[in-house]
Amino acid sequence: MALETDAKNSNAVAPGDAATVATTKAKENNSSAGKKQQQQQQPNQNQNLVNGNGNAADGPAAKKKGKKNRNKSPPEPAAEPVEASLSNGHAEKTTSEEGGDTAAPDTNANVGEKSEDGGGAAPGSELETEDIDLDALHEVGITVNISSPGADILSVQLSSMELVQEIHQLLMDREETCHRTCFSLQLDNVTLDNFAELKTIEQLEQGSTIRVVEEPYTMREARIHVRHVRDLLKNLDPADAYNGIDCTSLTYLNTITQGDLLDKKKTRPDSVDCTPPEYVTPGVSEPPLLPLHPNIKNAKGPQALKVLTTSAWNPPPGPRKLHGDLMYLYVVTMEDKRFHISACSKGFYINQSTDDTFNPKPDNPSHLSHSLIDLLSHISPSFRRAFQTIQKRRTTRHAFERVATPYQVYQWASPVLEHTVDAIRAEDAFSSKLGYEEHIPGQTRDWNEELQTTRELPRKTLPERLLRERAIFKVHGDFVTAATRGAMAVIDGNVLAINPGEDAKMQMFIWNNIFFSLGFDVRDHYKELGGDAAAFVAPRYDLHGVRVYNAVDVEGLYTLGTVVIDYRGYRVTAQSIIPGILEREQEQSVVYGSIDFGKTVLSHPKYLDLLRQAGKHLKILPHAVLNERDEPVELCSSVECKGIIGNDGRHYILDLLRTFPPDVNFLKLPEVQLSKELVDMGFPIEHRHKLCCLRQELLEAFIEDRYVSFIRIAAVHLQQLNAKKQSEKTEEKALPALEEAEKESSETKEAEAEKPVEKKEEEKQQPSSNETKTAEAMVNAIREAQSNVATSNEVQAAEVVKRACAAVGSLKEKEFDFRFNPDVFSNGIRHVDGEEGTCSSLAKQKVLVQDAAEFLVVKQIPAFIKEHLAHSSPPIDGQSLTESLHSHGINVRYLGKVIKLLAQMPRMDYLHRIAVLELIVRATKHIYYTYMQNTEPLHLSAAISHFLNCLLTTGPVNPAVSSEEAHKKRSNGNKHNKHKSKGNKQQASGNQNGSSAGSSSGGSSSSSDWTLVTPRSLWQQIRREAKSYWDWELDCDSIETAVSKYGILRISLLRAFCLKVGIQVLLREYNFESKHKPTFGDEDIVNVFPVVKHISPRATDAYNFYTTGQAKIQQGMFKEGYELISEALNLLNNVFGAMHQENGSCLRMLARLSYLLGDAQDALAIQQRAVIMSERVNGIDHPSTILEYTHLSLYSFANGHVGMSLKLLYRARYLMVLICGEDHPEVALIDSNISLILHALGEYELSLRFIEHALKLNIKYFGSKAMHVAFSYHLMARTQSCMGDFRSALNNEKETYSIYKSQVGEKHEKTRDSAECLRLLTQQAVLLQRKMNDIYSNGKLTSDLPPIHITPPSMGSVLDMLNTINGILFVQISQKDIVKVRSEIEKHFKANSAENEVNDAIKSIVAAANNNGDTEAETKDATKDNKDLAGASTQLTNGDKDAETAVASS
């Protein structure tokens, strides 16, 4: 959900938010005033235009105030570009109507000016090739005064491109005017059009006064006003966040820091309470659950009313309608007084009705108020006081805490929530509409029309692209919310099927213009592919296809809006509806592709043209198949891909489940012979369905690997071509020699992977010079070869290219061509085989797909493990592990093979444990889904609690159906149980989720199957599932053996499983070791929530700015990188609004850059927002949230908030232990930070406990001679010396010295520092020993020995060490050093340019040899486009790790 709302729609942004954000930002800006210039943003977050078709489209985007500026590269933003003001950046001042004006500071000075050296675009980026019209983003502001009844005059700065509607929203959000909803804005007594831009209003000038005029209510306006009042009163209540309603979510940063960090004063070390909670100290076995949601008792605000609901006297009878009555309300105040309220066109008043008597006349004395808040304040003093308290508490919270998130975030644990009377909640629950759809022209939304219309918006200029992407994002967010609600209604039995007479599994549904289908093989459609198992995974693969075609974004090619929802064990696919598809049979609709898996095949010239364009990017090979009449039919996609021309004339494609080629490692095919290496590893594995496909990331990595080989081989042959008197024999030997060299090189690299990380990092520095020499030699050889080619050796050059193509397996003999035929191994499809050596050769196509699958196992999996050996950004839970696997193109079905490799490496123990936990959770999910389908709604909570007992406990698990449920009469309300008696046996033995019949269902026909499951039987099923699905032997038969053998924490398993399948448990401490009663009871299951999968729309221009900024950072140009990433954040705010995952990534990077540029206060302000955003959009216990907390603790310490820094680290450590346990490299980093700060506070014993644990982990994961270990020894020595234990300190510092000496040599600064530390410690130890000897011999000190000095460290030295631990090193460098660094950078770029020259030379020779370079260039361009398309969102979320690494090393 985007932040924009209709002027009358207040549920997306909490009332008062925008105004509060403005004031919050003002505080933050003042805190860093004088350091940098403040930048105003106009993200235009409240636009919601309605076009002629009734589709929601957004107004003009991204505007800034400042001087006009047109540049190819982005302008230099000022210091606070990250201020994503939700009130559109309005700078406000309040002017008393009686007093004079107070001049507001000029917040727009010098904004938008271009720096002389900054903002250059990276080569090849879109920023370089397009003139970005930043004029549209930097409009000069205009100041207007707003006069509201009963409020001070408000002065607001606006952009001339903003809409009048945004002033509307601003006033509804401000504290003084938030209780008004029904008003118009007038200038010179002329009412302004809500959708007019300010620049189009002729009378509007600088300093003009706009009047707020109260308007008469209509029924719609009255209902909106009542809903708005309810939202105001519930503003502080976390119930909606726990219930997963209205895109609300939790954040606990302010609870932990007890207010805004920016408002706090620096703390003295002696005034800090630094004692860690018991569950945070090292050695905790099972972390408690309650601290996950701190201070929940005080989370709810004061109660203003007992009841606010619509009256049972609604609707007004005819005579009262004629008197202007709109609706009736019923209120019970805190004084226990009961009132019936009438809403009329003039406002609200108390009438004389009672619960039994209808008397609509006004009460005596009558009091009419235009605002319901005013009326309630008049009749109830308690309401007035409570409402003021709510407003005050709301304004103390950070603005980001109240803004709606783009998508709903669900909590896996919830406290007991009080269920209150709420008429609006009741209305929403049983309404067939979705919230505010009735406020949109045309009533019910036409989702398909909206989704397609937004994609058709123009995209030539930056403002047009921003508008288009913003509209796509908004409509997509609304569609996901509607689809999720509809899917839950379908499973809960609240939607009538369009084919109610058929079996429950075969039923389909239409709700709110969305089509819903269940994940079952309804008509044996997938019989040959795996039945229900294939039908269950098909929607997920289809969603992948929709994602990549949307990313390619070919104009004229349309996909359906698609969302996949897992809920209560069922998989539901929600799709938008193609116009006209329900009016005719499918056979009549399809004009391209096949509806029967290749028996009949159709093609269409328009589809061929569109899909050929997309295929260039997706590496899909056009191919021909035979139809039923043995005629060749050309296709540019898989056979299953269907093309349908809708009644709207658009060309739709659907059923994209086979967009990418099959994975032959999981298909047993007679014609496929895998390599011996794969066979030895157990491949091929027969999967339970035949839809296994390779990932797009893998194909890109494979093509890139082959292209690098192609360049190298061509370069070697060109050198040979230029050598004089070269024999034919030498030429024939060159290729095998090269392959042997490459093989040796790969073996060497794999051997090096086992060496300590430090040696690897040292050796990484060395090859740079060798690579430079090699590149230079290649360039020289190619230059000579080119001169020969140009004169007489074109035939020989063509032969070189031909050999290189043959060596890498190119589809074409004389061109580098790698594309894939997705149908190459499909059963029942008859291919048209081409000539040998051409791209239409079926044999070549099959070999290529086999090679890609082999590349995954032989290269990508080892590369994945090697990358994580350095522990630079280690996965923390199953989700981050899965994301990392996917980024390497590795499917999760290879998890068993990954686990086998990890088990052989002790230094990857933590990753092995996380992978085993993820595999157990996924296997259990397969079993749970069938288990849930065989459970009646009456027994859901009992069945779920019984399942959790079987999974997590060893005590008694006898299922006890509660007496309440036992006495309920059985109901057949749920359609999925209508046919249980005759169809249950089939369903019980069926395999909807992909588990084998024997392993995932009891095979019983009774709907009480769930009562038969025991811990032993469940773990046996999990073992069978692990073996059959992942080919991995799970060596445990109970939770105890899993805990003892693999080190899994039960609380971590509970969390992972609840998140995976959508269970919400009660927030309390669970005793998993209980031997007397079950751990979980049915009252512990609070709710079940949907698990939603959908595509994430992109912000392309923001992505380009971001990646260019990353490139600048990696070059050490922090200031320029800061400016570019600030601009990226600005654009993200325009597309996504202020709350989004990618905005959080930008904020984290900007905070780190601010810190490096010396502005710790600015870093603190930005990082605080990053933490809140991560908690809101990712989750309070998400791995990203932990990372944000650790960053914030560093900046807090740098700003003097020592106690807060410790609290933040304690929170981060608790979350880490909850998710994955203490045995993790990141815990070592957190413990080192905690130890240092405790050391600074003089808590030496506590400090020693944490640093000892960090040392133990560092030795385990980095090796005993690693630099991390040396630093840990040094910290221990410092702490022990402060405790007076000089002997131990001396021993530890000796270890430090030994490691530094062996790693960096005796002359290195670190070694010399350690030697000096050793000298001082030795001196102090000798001194102490003399004193001790003197006391022992004489009973007292007799000699005049100097005192022992134990100097506590200064805060500055502690901060320096914290920086070092966290990878930040500030270095003072001389002019001589600058010159040296510059020469090194130039050398680096020279090497890069040499490589580029090699590539360019090869390409030119290829072109010369073929006399046609178009195809090759096109292939390479497509490869580049493919890289740009691949995972742009993932890059934006995770890509900053590389840049942060560069930041750290710089």
UniProtKB/Swiss-Prot annotation:
Residues 29-60, 984-1008 have a biased composition (Low complexity). Coiled coil: none annotated. Residues 725-734, 743-765, 1417-1428 have a biased composition (Basic and acidic residues). GO terms for cellular component: cytosol. TPR repeats lie at residues 1102-1135, 1228-1261, 1263-1296. One of its GO terms (molecular function) is mRNA binding. Keywords: Cytoplasm, Phosphoprotein, Repeat, TPR repeat. Residues 62-71, 968-983 have a biased composition (Basic residues). One of its GO terms (biological process) is intracellular distribution of mitochondria. mRNA-binding protein involved in proper cytoplasmic distribution of mitochondria. This is Protein clueless. It comes from Drosophila ananassae (Fruit fly). The gene is clu.
